[in-house]
A protein has these predicted regions:
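Glycine-rich beta->alpha junctions and the first turn(s) of the following alpha-helix
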Residues: 1-58, 125, 147-149
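Hydrophobic alpha-helical segments of membrane proteins
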Residues: 92-100
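Generic, well-ordered alpha-helical scaffold segments in large soluble proteins
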Residues: 22-29, 66, 99, 118-121, ...
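C-terminal helix-coil-helix/basic helical segment that borders enzyme active sites and/or dimer interfaces
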Residues: 27, 31-38, 54-88, 101-106
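Charge-rich, acidic-biased intrinsically disordered regions
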Residues: 42, 46, 79-87, 108-121
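Short, conserved micro-motifs enriched in small and acidic residues
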Residues: 6-13, 17, 79, 83, ...
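Glycine-rich phosphate/cofactor-binding loops in nucleotide/flavin-utilizing enzymes
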Residues: 104-149
Length: 149
């Protein structure tokens, strides 16, 4: 592992991609699925849910990108930023995939449906390469003592 490199920063970016895929898959489904005489995407509550999903995706993307740029320009890096990127991005990916399953209705958990696969992968991300709670507990003391937030 080179200076400034932490694999969790890369996982943050990977799971931002998963979250984005779950959002896009859900948006397309909501454009096609008709409920109550109109596409799901035309229902206000669905629009609100899609808005929240995209906001979370873009927030996670911005943070994960900032961590990658920070690590690239600082030879020692800050491991807790990388851990925070992984923790935040995997949590967002899980939430987005879960919302996607919900908006897909009964089809959301059917084998062979992309959103179901994304949901399973997002769930695995919460424990992959260190469970999120463990990574947060590992990083918290350094964050507190360095005051670099």
């Amino acid at each position: 592992m080179g200076a400034g490199f932490n694999p969790n920063a890369g996982l943050g970016m990977l799971f931002v991609g998963l979250a984005r895929a779950a959002f896009e898959e859900t948006l397309e489904y909501c454009k096609q699925r008709v409920q109550g005489g109109k596409p799901l995407v035309e229902h206000q509550l669905v629009q609100r849910k899609l808005f929240d999903m995209l906001t979370k995706v873009e927030t996670a993307r911005a943070y994960a990108r900032a961590v990658m740029l920070y690590n690239a320009s600082n030879p020692l890096g800050l491991g807790y930023y990388s851990n925070a990127s992984k923790v935040y991005a995997t949590q967002v990916a899980f939430e987005i995939a879960s919302d996607g399953v919900q908006l897909h209705g009964g089809m959301g958990l059917a084998k062979g449906i992309l959103i179901e696969k994304l949901f399973r992968d997002a769930r695995a991300g919460l424990i992959e390469d260190g469970a999120n709670d463990s990574l947060a507990l590992l990083a918290a003391p350094t964050m507190i003592t360095s005051h670099a937030y």
